């Protein structure tokens, strides 16, 4: 089997850390098509990670569901995927979750703290130990399925481990009771009277001695339980810095995009109802939440739905600072904002359809939408956000402003060309004058003086 370096940035053929080249096979057709990772188990053993981790990483990166069958060592990613692309994704996983950040060696272990919901990485080669700095959707999966967990339980839940511990405890209790019964039978053959009572009291005494009494200290420890309600979590997030908020691990990563958009929708709606959207701190909080939910580009679509009414002109002017936080230097977010504007126009068609050109000009004048984004949008009628008829009508109403933009662009380009031509002519004239001056200097005398010398030469000839 062909092998490659675990760290593929190392080209040394004698590099000691090798792994099998990933093999994939596409099975099925239509909606049931899937990519089977044939040798994922061998690859996982070579890099020292459970096979579920890179498989889940593929699913997060490709937006596909994953299936695990530990008994048959079968790992599947839904959809048809090229093996070379999967190998590149595997390199990304190794870079983020396997290689040591200090020495780049793959001799590392991951340790999960279920209490703190953190992942630590330790290196056997250089001794490095620290928190994993990578913030990825697969982090949540790793926290729920730590490396120390039985591989067959990974991908399901921790309940199996708890269930096995309870079963073991039950078996131990059963063994203990059987031992006590045998002791009672052995000693109980002599007498059935007071001896039985003494044996029962003796057994109770042994059980009481085995179970430690509760102390005040134990009661104090029980009072330190963590409140995991939504209000408590939101309060703790408020105490974090902006950078730490983006690094927190949340179960929201496992939710679909629609569910994450709904979470952001409810947050914006709550801030709007409480009239907090004028606060700069609220703007920062919304941006951080959108980044955490990985919907920063689609957030303007939510803002348009909640903030724009039939008085969209005033709404845009009022909420310009908030809109700029999402659309500034972000063409994708601007395109989704245009989609939100289209939906608003469709909702208030009788009032806003005739004002479309002015609405787009307002967005342009306030620097919320860039010229290039508007011109790109105008090239094609799309029914992504509204019906095709409404989209075509909006494009038609916006055409005067689009033509104005195009003409302004052409005029600016023509004026720039004219300025360039004039500057070239000026440079040519000045250079010609300089060249003429140089010729006079080279002759060493002004033109009039040269004429006088010619006259003097004529006189001298006549005299001769």
Curated annotation (Swiss-Prot):
The keyword Ribosomal protein does not apply. CDD domains: W2_eIF5. Keywords: GTP-binding, Initiation factor, Nucleotide-binding, Phosphoprotein, Protein biosynthesis. One of its GO terms (molecular function) is translation initiation factor activity. Residues 174-184 have a biased composition (Polar residues). Residues 145-203, 409-464 are annotated as: Disordered. The modification Phosphoserine is found at residues 9, 412-413, 415. It holds the Pfam family eIF-5_eIF-2B. Residues 410-427, 451-464 have a biased composition (Acidic residues). GTP binds at residues 28-35. SMART domains: eIF2B_5 (SM00653), eIF5C (SM00515). GO terms for cellular component: cytosol. It comes from the Eukaryota. GO terms for biological process: formation of cytoplasmic translation initiation complex; translational initiation. InterPro entries: ARM-type_fold, IF2/IF5, Transl_init_fac_IF2/IF5_dom, Transl_init_fac_IF2/IF5_N, Transl_init_fac_IF2/IF5_Zn-bd, W2_domain. Residues 254-415 form the W2 domain. Belongs to the eIF-2-beta/eIF-5 family. Catalyzes the hydrolysis of GTP bound to the 40S ribosomal initiation complex (40S.mRNA.Met-tRNA[F].eIF-2.GTP) with the subsequent joining of a 60S ribosomal subunit resulting in the release of eIF-2 and the guanine nucleotide. The subsequent joining of a 60S ribosomal subunit results in the formation of a functional 80S initiation complex (80S.mRNA.Met-tRNA[F]). This is Eukaryotic translation initiation factor 5. It comes from Drosophila melanogaster.
């Amino acid at each position: 089997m062909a092998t490659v370096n675990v760290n593929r940035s190392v080209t040394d053929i004698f590099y000691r850390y090798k792994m099998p080249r990933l093999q994939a096979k596409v099975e099925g057709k239509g909606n049931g098509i899937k990519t089977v990772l044939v040798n994922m188990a061998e690859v996982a053993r070579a890099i020292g990670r459970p096979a579920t981790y890179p498989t889940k990483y593929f699913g997060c990166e490709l937006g596909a569901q994953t299936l695990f069958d530990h008994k048959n060592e079968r790992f599947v990613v839904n959809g048809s995927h090229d093996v070379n692309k999967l190998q590149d994704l595997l390199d990304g996983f190794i870079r983020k979750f396997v290689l040591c950040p200090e020495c780049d060696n793959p001799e590392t272990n991951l340790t999960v703290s279920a209490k703190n919901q953190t992942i630590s990485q330790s290196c056997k080669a250089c001794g490095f130990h620290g928190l994993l700095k990578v913030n990825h959707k697969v982090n949540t999966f790793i926290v729920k399925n730590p490396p120390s967990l039985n591989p067959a339980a990974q991908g399901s839940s921790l309940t199996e481990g708890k269930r096995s511990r309870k079963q073991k405890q039950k078996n131990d209790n059963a063994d203990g009771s059987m031992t006590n019964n045998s002791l009672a039978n052995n000693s109980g053959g002599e007498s059935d009277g007071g001896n039985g009572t003494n044996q029962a009291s003796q057994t109770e005494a042994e059980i009481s001695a085995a179970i430690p009494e509760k102390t005040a200290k134990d009661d104090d420890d029980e009072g330190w339980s963590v409140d995991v309600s939504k209000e408590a979590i939101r309060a703790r997030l408020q105490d974090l810095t902006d950078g730490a908020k983006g690094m927190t691990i949340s179960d929201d990563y496992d939710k679909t995009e629609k569910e994450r958009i709904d979470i952001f929708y409810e947050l914006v709606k709550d801030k709007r109802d409480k009239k907090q959207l004028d606060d700069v701190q609220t703007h920062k909080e919304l941006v951080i939440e959108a980044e955490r939910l990985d919907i920063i580009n689609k957030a303007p679509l939510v803002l348009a739905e909640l903030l724009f009414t039939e008085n969209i002109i005033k709404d845009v002017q009022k909420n310009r600072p908030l809109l700029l936080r999402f659309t500034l230097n972000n063409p994708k977010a601007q395109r989704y904002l245009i989609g939100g504007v289209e939906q608003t126009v469709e909702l208030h068609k009788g009032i806003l359809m005739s004002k479309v050109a002015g609405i787009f000009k307002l967005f342009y004048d306030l620097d919320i939408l860039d010229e290039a984004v508007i011109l790109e949008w105008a090239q094609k009628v799309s029914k992504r956000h509204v019906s095709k008829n409404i989209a075509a009508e909006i494009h038609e109403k916006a055409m005067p402003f689009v033509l104005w933009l195009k003409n302004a662009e052409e005029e600016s380009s023509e004026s720039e060309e004219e300025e360039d031509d004039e500057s070239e002519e000026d440079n040519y004239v000045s250079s010609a004058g300089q060249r003429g001056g140089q010729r006079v200097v080279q002759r060493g005398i002004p033109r009039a003086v040269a004429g006088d010398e010619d006259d003097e030469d004529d006189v001298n000839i006549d005299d001769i």
